[in-house]
Amino acid sequence: MGKEPLTLKSIQVAVEELYPNKARALTLAQHSRAPSPRLRSRLFSKALKGDHRCGETETPKSCSEVAGCKAAMRHQGKIPEELSLDDRARTQKKWGRGKWEPEPSSKPPREATLEERHARGEKHLGVEIEKTSGEIIRCEKCKRERELQQSLERERLSLGTSELDMGKGPMYDVEKLVRTRSCRRSPEANPASGEEGWKGDSHRSSPRNPTQELRRPSKSMDKKEDRGPEDQESHAQGAAKAKKDLVEVLPVTEEGLREVKKDTRPMSRSKHGGWLLREHQAGFEKLRRTRGEEKEAEKEKKPCMSGGRRMTLRDDQPAKLEKEPKTRPEENKPERPSGRKPRPMGIIAANVEKHYETGRVIGDGNFAVVKECRHRETRQAYAMKIIDKSRLKGKEDMVDSEILIIQSLSHPNIVKLHEVYETDMEIYLILEYVQGGDLFDAIIESVKFPEPDAALMIMDLCKALVHMHDKSIVHRDLKPENLLVQRNEDKSTTLKLADFGLAKHVVRPIFTVCGTPTYVAPEILSEKGYGLEVDMWAAGVILYILLCGFPPFRSPERDQDELFNIIQLGHFEFLPPYWDNISDAAKDLVSRLLVVDPKKRYTAHQVLQHPWIETAGKTNTVKRQKQVSPSSEGHFRSQHKRVVEQVS
């Protein structure tokens, strides 16, 4: 070779020429046993003194492999091998730089590069060569520390699984406990108290503050489990077994069942307490009872929302028994005073035609038709009010209310109820029959009435209202059509109040807008709440019509909205010549009834004490007023017909 410098390439070429079959032996020698750190230090120091670039050689996967390669070459004792090896390494370096091209001054992170390439099984090309023996030793220390850490983790995982199988640890959710294992601190962070810190954070120690301990697993919900599938399977089996044992030991109460249904997450923590020690089960029951009492206290503070609960029928029965009147009112309707009123007593479920024979129609309405009828045995005449159920459309309570109110009233000036029949399609009210017709027909016939007759009629009406109002019952539909005229044998007349379809017990202000437009009170239209006073307003309108033949509030254009505005204003006049012959006492009573403010309006008792009513009662034989001419009577009749059209 002459004076050529001794290089690794020349040694490699010489070795290949002399020992063509020894290349594989050199490669295999890399996996031999690693020598001591002292020997490796000498090898690398020698290489640095010889000024050959060790980093440009084929770098082994670990420090032990590098030392093994050098030891194999020294064991052979052939310098030409080193020359040929140097040439081979330089050839690979040229090819490798085409791929990697690392900067001369850059030094990639040692641990990250080694671990990443070791995982991919690649050879580490382009690593800096200026590594001292101290760095190699530290790499070996890191490897040993990692192995020690992995062994400690395996021991901890096995210890945790054994804890679960033994039934140890506080109340934790199974899934949260599994996820917590991956986020514990490594021994590097706390090397001095590695095992001691594990005991402090372990699930064997019973927590002083259960609330804080229960909140810990939530911090590690996003962590991943490092254990293998076998460890997870064994952990799940152990937890399931412990849970089964706990369920068999602990009694399951109805309160516990309801708590499981309402709040799954808190109960899952307590129900999955299968890794509790057996001797601590009593404390667990006490804690669960405390949680149950807190739940019950919260339920008492908050309104019950049964719609959001998901319970079985068995679990829900106690709650339904406690909340029965609120959740299922339809079963206790007859017994509940605050809900729908009970059905009236004495309703006969039979065919009414077997007992009564019907005659002509004497009246009709929105829901009913009134016919004459006669009892088949006694031959007594009655009025049969036939109510069609199909027209009620859920307003059956109105009929029941009417029946109950009529049954509660007993007065000479109120129509009496005799019997009630009911079938699947209709309801039959057998009422007192008044032969004289209603007051509306009487007004059409007579146009107007003398003051004594009008006073007697208002007296009869107010007597009926006194009886009703004393029972806090408001009629709400007073009008001439609902006042029946009974003609007595002495040629006198008596008014009887009928049709209690809109009657109602007044216990608080009513806001329902109802009635007939001509007779409706202003407080009903204002929708500010009303009471018994609306009947007295209607009585004032009826008195006005009885004295002059037309209503006090009229719309020239027959516009209902305009009529309602006039009623709410309360302006009316005693128009001449119709009121020229009417006494001031009669006008005074009308003025005291047609008052917009219901508090200032006359009551039924005050009407009966008015001088005009008292005088009419005492002097029933006062001369009738002078009859008006036929032409004026025809004028009043046509005007009253227009009023009737407005009412209809």
From Swiss-Prot:
Bias kind Basic and acidic residues: ranges: 98-127, 213-234, 255-266, 277-303, 312-338
Gene3D superfamilies according to UniProt: Phosphorylase Kinase, domain 1 (3.30.200.20), Transferase(Phosphotransferase) domain 1 (1.10.510.10)
Residues in Protein kinase domain copies: 356-613
Compartment list: Cytoplasm; Nucleus
Annotated ATP binding sites: I362, G363, D364, G365, N366, F367, A368, V369, V370, K385
Enzyme Commission no: 2.7.11.1
GO molecular function, one term: protein serine/threonine kinase activity
Positions of the catalytic residues: D477
Catalyses which reaction(s): L-seryl-[protein] + ATP = O-phospho-L-seryl-[protein] + ADP + H(+); L-threonyl-[protein] + ATP = O-phospho-L-threonyl-[protein] + ADP + H(+)
One Pfam assignment: Pkinase
GO biological process: protein localization to nucleus
Consequence recorded when altering S472N: In a lung large cell carcinoma sample; somatic mutation
PANTHER family assigned to the protein according to its UniProt record, in alphabetical order: SERINE/THREONINE-PROTEIN KINASE
Name by which UniProt lists this protein: Serine/threonine-protein kinase DCLK3
